[in-house]
Every structure is written in C-alpha cells, then in structure tokens.
Amino acid sequence: QIINIDGSGNRLSESLFGPKRVYYVIGKNKIAPDLSSAMDRARNIACPKNAARFNKKTPCVVSDDKKCYDCNSPERICNAILILERPCTGMEVEMVFINEDLGY
C-alpha cells in the first residue's frame, strides 16, 4: 500500500489517472510495518514538518507536541488522503527504494 497526503489533491489525481507510468522514489524512513503505523507517521511526523516548511500556522506546527489535530485551518496541507492498493487500470507503477532517509 502507498499512502499519499495532499492539500489540494492535484498530486493525488495524477497518481490515479493521467500518466501511463508513475514512479515512486521511497526512502527507508517512509516504510512502515502496517497501514495504521504509516498513517500515524504521515499525519504526525511528515505533515507537521512539511507544513512548517511552508510556514503554515496550523495547530500541528504551532503546538509544542507537533502532532496532527485534524484541524479545520484554511492553511491545512493534508486535506486529501489516498491509499493506493494496486495500480489503476492501464497504469504501471514502479517503486524505487533508496536505503537512506528522504524527505519527511
């Protein structure tokens, strides 16, 4: 399974429809043992760090614990979540695993 979180959905839509081939480059820090752990990592580690990178003033950025509050902030960057189980019809997906931490 691949989890992808986006603010406007434009990157998610391209993961589902459009190109015939999609490549994912995945660092070792992005691999989780199960879906629950992956969602927790994405929402409570990656999203707050990415929101901070964009200088957003969301609860996950301004709070001391830097975790997701499932907020309604207009600056929220995690409005859409995609869980890709298998490639969509007519699309090829290739995953490239890199043995180092990449991104958040």
Write out the residue ranges for each language-model feature.
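Conserved phosphate- and dinucleotide-binding cores of soluble alpha/beta proteins
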Residues: 2-104
